[in-house]
Amino acid sequence: MTLSDNPKVVIATPLGDIKMEIYADKAPVTSENFLRYVDDGLYDGTFFFRTVTMENQPDSPVKIEVIQGGMVPKDRAYPSTYPPIEHETTEMTGLRHVDGAISMARMKPGSATSSFFICIGDQPELDYGGKRNPDRQGFAAFGQVVEGMGVVREIQMRPHDDQRLEPPIDILRVSRTG
């Protein structure tokens, strides 16, 4: 795949659009999982529900800055998530958690489903070997914001209670483009 062959996705929010390139060529398992949620409309009507700033993680020795979204609402009639996917580390893909990187949230390796986050600033502690997760496997980066980082930063600065956005920011629609 060339750069132009990679899928493009737009997240529509009331604050504006976030346009992303999905690196299906470098992170095929993670990209396919994310695009399955997109294509099936499962992100439509969900939320950005978490913001992590330097100020709201006082007990964390390793600080990061991200916004997190993609939880499928519990009132959906169909299953909320597909099975968890294999963990594609940044060591495997060559991708890094740089400003605007999109990555899958997880607890343990192989537990990622629908929840994703977008990095604000470079976040090397989220890469393979980084110290944010004790297992040091990092998180599975799979794309990059190409337009709309102003919207991402605006979401990050919205009112929050601890790390929970209050109110959460609506994800109106997530769809492929061009």
Residue ranges and their predicted role:
Residues 1-178:
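Cyclophilin-like peptidyl-prolyl cis-trans isomerases
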